[in-house]
């Protein structure tokens, strides 16, 4: 029988121990890391050039490693050993840690190892999505949190989303669901700042535990420690569902960045259950010093005075409001002091009303052209009837011209007719003052009416128009000081003026249509004229025509308030 030594000789080299996988350890990379930590990126590039090795780190990776590197303080091992509860182990290569792992004191779902959790199912979400919901990843995470009943376990690199945290806090406070949160050590300060801004103190939450987590640690011969970061992201709910992917709980990932998320359920969740318990055992609590520093910084930011925006240049609307405020505080001041400035401000506001006025004038002019067409009537009455129609039309046109030729101030002041009538009944001194300013506008309107009408009948209608314009100008002179009163807004005045004009034009239009219908019906009975039955029929029509002409001549006097 062969002994053990002979059996070992027969075994080929490396047969008992498996060969190490290639590229698992590289001494050249370790030396390059030493050069990077001690001398910076230039020293590392020089080393790689001397060794004729390609670069294995990008510029962002170099900066990240230098930012995570820290000099290991003396006595670090002694401090870690003193933190242990039982330091009786003297094994050179211990298979258990001397530091006791943290306990999941808030509870955990009672799943035994290998217990069946259902058929594995996968739901895939991409963001941004092109379906009914754009932000599917965020909505899927919030739906999982709302459905939690037993436990919520979260591992995240960066957590600053207010909406998701509110859902977690609501489940913790209202439904009393245990919550475990593991965050990257370098990003936990941002999470604490968000909590304090929302008015939540995590150290006082009875159903929430927040701990720090780091990646792998790399030690160099010079005593430098490089701490890795956490890139794991998953949300475990009730031990039966888990959401994982590259989606972080931040506003930028929720609104700007593209990401994906997998929602898993069934037996595959057991792997994430075990991984979370391992990570929770490796985590560290948040120090009281860090909590106090974050709290004091947030309080200092809240106490800082808000910087007011720089003063802007005054605009047209602000100047108008200032002038109205001044006049409302002193309503007895004279109108001429502010008339020039108010003219410039009102032109822009009155542009819409002026356009409607011009369109209405065009409608009246069109009706005038339609009415001037000669109609076949009786020989002894046709000319007089046409002349009468022209008289009525010229009267309305003169009234329109008299109104449009007035200044902007007079047109705007004419909207205060109701207010003027009130003032006449209560304040007699103001009415006597306003009547002294009427001759100038009366003469201007009279000249306009005389130029637009040449016959004697048109002159009488023009005098009537000038009389009405005189009254309106009196009211405008009186209402100059009362126009700025706050109980009569400028917009309401324009609306009232537009309604009055529309009603006035509709009245004139109805009168003209009535006259056209009368003349048309008169032309449809030629047999009566040829059979010498005209006197009886013509007498009846002449009375109707006479009444229509009188009504049309007085059409200017029809106002909505009469």
Swiss-Prot record:
Keywords: Cell cycle, Cell division, Cytoplasm, Cytoskeleton, Mitosis. One of its GO terms (cellular component) is cytosol. It holds the Pfam family SACK1. The keyword Lipid metabolism does not apply. Residues 424-472 are annotated as: Disordered. It is found in: Cytoplasm; Cytoplasm, Cytoskeleton, Spindle; Cytoplasm, Cytoskeleton, Spindle pole. Disulfide bonds: none annotated. Residues 425-472 have a biased composition (Low complexity). Belongs to the FAM83 family. This is Protein FAM83D-B.
